[in-house]
Amino acid sequence: MTPISAIGDYNGHVGLGVKCSKEVATAIRGAIILAKLSIVPVRRGFWGNKIGRPHTVPCKFTGKCGSVWVRLIPAPRGTGIVSAPVPKKLLQMAGIDDCYTSARGSTGTLGNFAKATYAAVTAIYAYLTLDLWKETIFQKSPYQEFTDYLSKNHKPVGVCRSRR
């Protein structure tokens, strides 16, 4: 038996565990332990204006497992999660309120569908959006810094050599 266990706090953390075992209780217990060990943070963002708290994914993300591709697309506030039941539950556990999803491949394979959704959700935290970029301070080159001095006409300085 191969149970799939999802765990989340509905506020920015989600985990997924899959365990295979001959006994049902052992498999379920192992899947729960693996789900707890694989908890990842989920960064949420805005769609449109930045009013209120973050409610959707920051930008489009894709996850793949087996033949299944899952794409998470930001949605306006109040849309809800427009998805099949498997990704919908994972996204709810992650604390995402509004999201469109697109799935391709053999989505009837429940394990691959859940793993592809989890892969897309983990990709969210790995991607740095524009608001998280560190401010870059550029230093001027010496030619730019002293351009006014270098542009002035200077008298050529000759070297006097004495004859011996």
Where is each model-derived feature located?
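Ribosome-associated RNA-binding proteins
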Residues: M1-R164
